[in-house]
From Swiss-Prot:
Pfam families tied to this protein: MMR_HSR1 (PF01926)
Gene Ontology MF term list: GTP binding; metal ion binding
GO biological process, one term: division septum assembly
Keyword Cell division: yes
Name of this protein: Probable GTP-binding protein EngB
Keywords annotated in UniProt: Cell cycle, Cell division, GTP-binding, Magnesium, Metal-binding, Nucleotide-binding, Septation
Domain (EngB-type G) ranges: 25-199
Native source organism of the sequence: Salmonella paratyphi C (strain RKS4594)
Gene3D superfamilies: P-loop containing nucleotide triphosphate hydrolases
Binding residues annotated for GTP, in chain numbering: 33-40, 60-64, 78-81, 145-148, 178-180
Cofactors, names only: Mg(2+)
């Protein structure tokens, strides 16, 4: 298994929908979660870059599909956050459409990191996201973010509860506690990404006429 250097990750582009993304080949691992789950912070912590992914105090700022390249053909994708109430309905529909299209049609999507606040895990949309990935044979890593907000005992209890709950999905779903602030769980995230990028088969580019 190759240990990739995530500090070399660089921003490639932002796209409103999959039609504006580059060729659908290689391997992509997407980060998904509710608007305040800490996706951008997790990406910045993983790559040890303070501003690779723009963090915001205002949930719902990630409205585009943001693409980052680790090395050639291996990409991380920051998906639009879901489930934030204070967003105009039309805008919300547009994001959800872009999100759904990416999840359903992007062939190079091979792994999904679902982030959820450890204090409020497994909301309906989180469960739908895991269910969809399992049905699509996509491996899932659940990160319970903001783990530093709970004392050790409560953290362990939440972790065990979620691990127990995801068994019902009957899929390849791993659950870890994560804290961008304390750098907890970053090694587990790196290990999982390394295994996905090393072991999953990259998608070949479709040539015109195929």
């Amino acid at each position: 298994m190759t240990n990739l250097n995530y500090q070399q990750t660089h921003f490639v582009m932002s796209a409103p929908d999959i039609r504006h993304l580059p060729s659908d080949c290689g391997i992509e691992v997407a980060f998904a979660g509710r608007s305040n789950a800490g996706k951008s912070s997790a990406l910045n912590t993983l790559t040890n870059q303070k501003s690779l992914a723009r963090t915001s105090k205002t949930p719902g700022r990630t409205q585009l599909i943001n693409l980052f390249e680790v090395v050639d053909g291996k990409r991380l994708v920051d998906l639009p956050g879901y489930g934030y109430a204070e967003v105009p309905e039309e805008m919300k529909r547009k994001w959800q459409r872009a999100l759904g299209e990416y999840l359903e049609k992007r062939r190079s999507l091979q792994g999904l990191v679902v982030l959820m606040d450890i204090r409020h895990p497994l909301k309906d949309l989180d469960q739908q996201m895991i269910q969809w990935a399992v049905e699509s044979n996509i491996q899932v890593l659940v990160l319970l973010t903001k783990a530093d907000k709970l004392a050790s005992g409560a953290r362990k209890a939440q972790l065990n509860m979620v691990r127990e709950a995801v068994l019902a999905f009957n899929g390849d779903v791993q659950v870890e506690a994560f804290s961008s602030l304390k750098k907890q769980g970053v090694d587990k995230l790196r290990q999982k990404l390394d295994s996905w990028f090393s072991e999953l088969a990259p998608v070949e580019e479709i040539q015109d006429g195929e």
